Each structure stands twice: as structure tokens, then as C-alpha cells.
């Protein structure tokens, strides 16, 4: 199974067996994380994998799993989006190996040892004690037509990219993303949170935007679409009442011919 195929079958796992993952598999998982490329390869990140008895977690909505992976990042522009893009690639990879995972957005380590970097996200993982997969019909997602504003041509490339993004997981399944699609680009926005808990929710929204971008980039890699992620000055200069501009995927002409 490929990571692209995993997009259409993966589900969050909240019940795990206590079975050990082999050292060789753990090494592969660690290497995959280190080799993954986000939207900002220049941002310094660090992965840390540990068993549940090695560190104590604090926070809400924690899942009891045999293993956890932590993603740290330097704090800079786009770091949350980049982290979401990286960690979702790892989640899809785990699924292809028969390993379940679940984001722990409300969890923190009781003793955080990386002083110069921010702990962006913790993900629980291990062999599942519940079904690993779900059918396409079981996804509880907003319809594509309610997420996308179409301007101009809308072909197979745009449809495949946006359908993959639509299926991305998000905090509390809020699905904060919205898209504007044209002939040669897709613009990604996220909803502005309400006043209560604004910064926390904004942080989650930006991480989730990275997760959606990950699905589109994985799709492009699998389907041989030629894309480039950019933030366009012409949009950055604008103020939007209800949305925050995340970035744009530029679609090059040869993609439609493949």
C-alpha cells in the first residue's frame, strides 16, 4: 500500500495492543521522519520516539498507547504548517505498515527536554486493537463543493488534490480549511477562530493546514503532478474578514497531460 492509498483508508486509532514494534521497524520509522520533506525544508525540526513508560504525558484527551512520537521545531514563520505537513506524512507511512496512530493535540510532556525548540505535536502509535481501516463512506467530512470556490477551469488535477485534502484529519474534526481553485493554482485558507481561545485554536488550524497540504503533496508525488508551494504577495497583502491565507499550490501545465 502507498501513502496515497492510505489517505482514503486511514482512521485515528484510540485503542492499542501492548505489542512491541521491532527495533528494525522503529529505526525505519525514525528514518522516515528524518527524511520527510515539508513545505519549508529549511526549518530545523527534531523527532523523538519513546515508549509510554519512558515519559509522562499531561493534558486533555490523551490516548493510552505503547509508543509516542514527538515533533519539535524551531519557532519561525510557517513552523506549525510545516510540522503538520511532516507529521501527517509519518502517520500515513505508519498506516502502510499496519501501525495505527492518533494525534494528541492536548498533550504535553511533563518534562520537556528541548529548551531551544517548541514541542509542536505528540502522536500516539502502535499496533491497533480496533479496526485499522475505514471505508471511504465512513469519512465524516464536509462536501467538496462547500469547501471550494472555483474560478475558471477545474480539471482532474484540481479534483484529485482537493479530494485528498478534504479527507485530512483535523483537531476535533473542525475541518478549518477552505480553498479557491483556478486553472493553474489552488489557494488554501483557514477559518479565523472565535475570540475564546483564539491563539490555541489558531495554532491548531495552522497545524491542520499543514496536514491538508501534506495530503495534496503526497497525491502530487503519487500521481506525478508538478506542483510548487508558495505564499503569494498579491494575496498576503489582502485582509480577509473570516479567513487566514495559508499559501498556494502552483500547478504546472504538464500535470494535466499525465
Predicted segments with their positions:
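Acidic, surface-exposed loops and disordered segments
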Residues: 1-258
